Amino acid sequence: MFTDKETHRKPFPTWAHLLHSEPSKQFVFGNWKMNKTLTEAQTFLKSFLSSDILSNPQIITGIIPPFTLLSACQQAVSDSPIFLGAQTTHEADSGAFTGEISAPMLKDIGVDFVLIGHSERRHIFHEQNPVLAEKAAAAIHSGMIPVLCIGETLEEQESGATQDILLNQLTIGLSKLPEQASFILAYEPVWAIGTGKVAHPDLVQETHAFCRKTIASLFSKDIAERTPILYGGSVKADNARSLSLCPDVNGLLVGGASLSSENFLSIIQQIDIP
């Protein structure tokens, strides 16, 4: 058992309700990447799930463990307000793809959402926008929420190409989704991930506003207004509040700082709710 009986909480509403509810909710997702053994995950969750910080219904929290921990983590968080995410998925439902995991498999073990196109998938594993569009569609068709990750490199940012890069990633990455699809967007400038460099809140707001305007042009103003747009890139407790104060920032995608329950809870505690 990961948790004691008294730490169990009533589950939060469904994703459909959350993504159509008032825009004041903030989302905070912790991406564990390729970290933690089962024992380490047990230790983390025992501490994490016992915190009263998680009781705020205006903050929607999710953890994104590696594939090997998804089933165990799902059992641990099933009676809590925590949602479960996967770090990627394959675009096909099944087949001869050794080492891959499909969206129906993830949904079957209780995964709620899945990252699509995290910068490390794009730049280390060379995942391209057309394939990511298929992965996002696969997540939707399997009943999960895709979290499309977009972002520019330092060279692209310094050359003034940020909006062109993001427009291309959004236009192609969202092209296979149904017109009324529910999805989440995560802006993660590549130059800020794991580097300790954080985009200035003014730049974050400007970029998020551009992304929302683009979503409106691709889908509708209504979908743009209700689509959560998260920021990711060296998020820590000392910058979480200033980032969450940006009008078009609806939450944070946290990397290394989410590996410690104490640090992750400190970030959640800093989130500003209007």
From Swiss-Prot:
Its EC number is 5.3.1.1. Substrate binds at residues 31-33, 194, 234, 255-256. The active site is at residues 118, 188. One of its GO terms (molecular function) is triose-phosphate isomerase activity. Keywords: Cytoplasm, Gluconeogenesis, Glycolysis, Isomerase. It is found in: Cytoplasm. One of its GO terms (biological process) is gluconeogenesis. Belongs to the triosephosphate isomerase family. This is Triosephosphate isomerase. It comes from Chlamydia trachomatis serovar L2 (strain ATCC VR-902B / DSM 19102 / 434/Bu). The gene is tpiA.
